A protein has these predicted regions:
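Charged docking surfaces used in two-component/phosphorelay signaling
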Residues: 16-24
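Acidic, metal-coordinating helix/loop segments flanking the phosphotransfer/catalytic sites
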Residues: 31-48, 66, 91
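His-Asp phosphorelay/catalytic-motif detector in bacterial-type signaling
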Residues: 45-47, 72-77
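Active-site residues of response regulator receiver
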Residues: 52, 82
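Receiver (REC) domain active-site loop signature in two-component systems and cognate sites
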Residues: 55
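C-terminal output helix
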Residues: 106-115
């Protein structure tokens, strides 16, 4: 059974690129437009979440905290995919429960390498 990954980004083009790349590698992908949408779609088995940081309604940090507050998803990998690369933002993400960080722009190969490493 394919691993299921949720990609969360307010940019449709980023969501589509992430989804296309991961589907090509055999993963099932759920798309969400922001943190609030992601929490509403977080049902059943999700093996990993890839989220932007800066989004309307509920940002990536708020989403991570919301996911980590649910026992069923307390330990799933969550990777931030964002233009933010400052140490303070990374520390804030890590404190909230982020597993890893990919800085935009990124290549599909970088994304796949991180996903495979995290889902081992």
């Amino acid at each position: 059974m394919a691993k299921r990954i949720m990609t969360v980004d307010d940019s449709a083009s980023v969501r589509q690129m992430v989804a296309f790349t991961l589907k090509k590698e055999g993963y099932d992908v759920i798309e969400a437009v922001d943190g609030k949408d992601a929490l509403s779609k977080l049902a059943g088995t999700v093996d990993m979440v890839i989220t932007d940081l800066n989004m309307p309604n509920l940002d990536g940090i708020g989403l991570i905290k919301g996911i980590r507050a649910q026992a069923a998803y307390k330990f799933i990998p969550i990777v931030m995919l964002t233009t933010e690369s400052q140490a303070a933002k990374k520390a804030e993400g890590k404190t909230a429960g982020a597993t890893g960080w990919i800085v935009k722009p990124f290549t599909p190969d970088q994304l796949v390498a991180v996903v495979k490493k995290v889902l081992r």
